[in-house]
Amino acid sequence: ISTAENNNNVGRNLYYYIIDKVTKKYLGTICMSSDYLDLTPRDNYIGWTREKKTDDKMINYTTVGSTIVPTQPLGFNYVGGKLLALLCLSDKVQNDWKKLYGDRLVSVTTTSLYGKAKAGGMSQYDNLKHWKKMGYSQGSVAYKPKKETTKRLRDWLKKYHSEKYFEWYVALKPSGQPYKRDHKNRSHQFAFSKLGIDKSIVRSEHQRGIYYSPLYTNTCEFLRGEISEDKLVKSFDTSTEYLVCLLYTSPSPRDSFR
């Protein structure tokens, strides 16, 4: 349903097929992953530091909608992308996150596909209730090398920079996860730099829109460590029924719960 190649994220991942109850047809697919560690507009909105995110592990209480892809013609004719974006906030996702990882989900992030480059910077998330536009990413996105190029880069690192190779591709944390976060991109950028390859060849100045949905009225206070989990106050109804009605019924029969 998409021409984009799927690349599994390192860390947490929840996968969903969205299926219509009546017709049993597939409406789209969603993947909820470990959230981005650094998104300046979002981080400024929350008011947290990198130390709070990592040392106190508050980043584990947030997630990113890394894949939000509707099937067609639902996506084009019936704003299916907006439907899937709302379902990323659902009780189902929150409960699965808590059950599988043990952390309460308090907010959701996502980024637009095209950013400023298309449609005047508008995306399927604009003007969508419960999603706040934070701004744009800094706009430096690495191109993905072909498999053959990736293999040659790894072989080169292993031969000429064995310590770095071990750090990125062999060493593991006690949890079994890679020792270095985002190790593939880091290793590629290191190799490109050492080989004298110009950044304009391997990176695109492509800015993406950043969107954020706090699930509680005091999500930011919680992520800053100012309140405990038991003090969280629900921001809006996150049942599947409400979220679907919110998009396809106006006004929603349950819109009084905000």
PLM region descriptions:
Residues 1, 93, 97, 153-157, ...:
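Generic structural signal of hydrophobic/aromatic residues within well-ordered alpha-helices
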Residues 1-14:
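Short, basic/aromatic recognition patches
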Residues 12-14, 21-162, 166-167:
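Acyl-donor binding region in acyl/amide transferases
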Residues 18, 32, 211-213:
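Short beta-strand element of the conserved SAM-dependent methyltransferase core
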Residues 144-208:
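Long, charge-rich alpha-helical interaction segments
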Residues 198, 202, 206-247:
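A positional "C-terminalness" feature that preferentially activates on distal terminal regions of long
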Residues 248-257:
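Conserved small/polar residues in nucleotide/adenosyl-binding loops
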